[in-house]
Amino acid sequence: MAKAKFERNKPHVNIGTIGHVDHGKTSLTAAITKVLGFLGSAEYKAYDQIDAAPEERERGITINTSHVEYQTETRHYAHVDCPGHADYVKNMITGAAQMDGAILVVSAADGPMPQTREHILLSHQVGVPYIIVFLNKCDMVDDDELIELVEMEVRELLSSYEFPGDDTPIIRGSALVALESTSTDINSPEYAPIVALMKEVDNYIPTPERATDKAFIMPVEDVFSITGRGTVATGRVEKGIVKVGDEVEIVGLMEAPKKTVVTGVEMFRKLLDQAEAGDNIGALLRGVQRTDIERGQVLAKPGSIKPHTYFEGQVYVLTSAEGGRHKPFFNGYRPQFYFRTTDVTGVIEIPEGTEMVMPGDHITMKIKLITPIAMEEGLKFAIREGGRTVGAGNVSKIIE
């Protein structure tokens, strides 16, 4: 069957849900597709369709990022449902990097929890520019004053991570009430909070200025082979434009970049002549074996970005209250560094005269990776150890 062409008639925005486990991120995502489905601009995806990876069902928690798409009257959205559980912060780091704005889901019954804080911190570190709050499960709280208190707490938390807490839109509602309603009228009261939320998302999150005029780069998230056609690399175009027939380089996780040609581009299972910054795509690559390319590398315009192993980074070390280390670390500390979609072990050199680095410190340090990563100044990374985030930073200077 021939694939339909993807129509680019509305501005495209990438958003996602973040927040503590069981506060209702996936239910809210399902409710948005249900309500916008009444306008004919979304396909309703039930909770268990979004929560779809096999290992998720047994635990009832979301592990991988799920992508859904929908439209409002003014925009086309790609929505990622980000993992909420602390074990899966690793995926949050790769998922949150794909957001022009985020919907922070907070249960009105529980208020902000440890992962609420962690996700706000991560959003700040990976550069999610806007956060809107959906205060979920309001049907479970009878006392308005309690909801007011939760709202104040959330605003303070946002402000403490440099988001404009006082001006952040907060919508109260219940995703479950919207999901359980049998009404097909979008004006039903149980759908009002979802309608109000999407209106705020339309208005508060600006249409991103896409970096389309910059050199093409796409971090590789996944790779698979299509029999008879070749190898496809999937990911979100970070900058620039890629056209069918363009020469690109595979950069990172190896000494020298490899050249190839993009022979096909598709998005949401539809073929495109070209893809631009912000698009989640699959790129078909000429003459590339399934084993020649892997998650953590990037596709880039030839010569535009180089692989490096040694750099200076500005680093913030999390406190134990933020889920970080309880103890300091010293010169020669070897954690994992998460860049874009993968982790690489590196060795830390702390500045002369500094004996150790304490939780809560903000420090400039040199980092030597064991494998090269496609790198430019300003690139963000997270520092991880034993499955948890212990620091965050960005590349301030490339040494070699």
Curated annotation (Swiss-Prot):
Residues 60-64 are annotated as: G2. Residues 19-26 are annotated as: G1. Residues 81-84 are annotated as: G3. Transmembrane segments: none annotated. Coiled coil: none annotated. Residues 10-209 form the tr-type G domain. Residues 136-139 are annotated as: G4. It catalyses: GTP + H2O = GDP + phosphate + H(+). Mg(2+) binds at residue 26. GO terms for molecular function: GTP binding; GTPase activity; translation elongation factor activity. Its EC number is 3.6.5.3. It holds the Pfam family GTP_EFTU_D2. It is found in: Cytoplasm. Keywords: Cytoplasm, Elongation factor, GTP-binding, Hydrolase, Magnesium, Metal-binding, Nucleotide-binding, Protein biosynthesis. GO terms for cellular component: cytosol. GTP hydrolase that promotes the GTP-dependent binding of aminoacyl-tRNA to the A-site of ribosomes during protein biosynthesis. Monomer. This is Elongation factor Tu. It comes from Ruminiclostridium cellulolyticum (strain ATCC 35319 / DSM 5812 / JCM 6584 / H10).
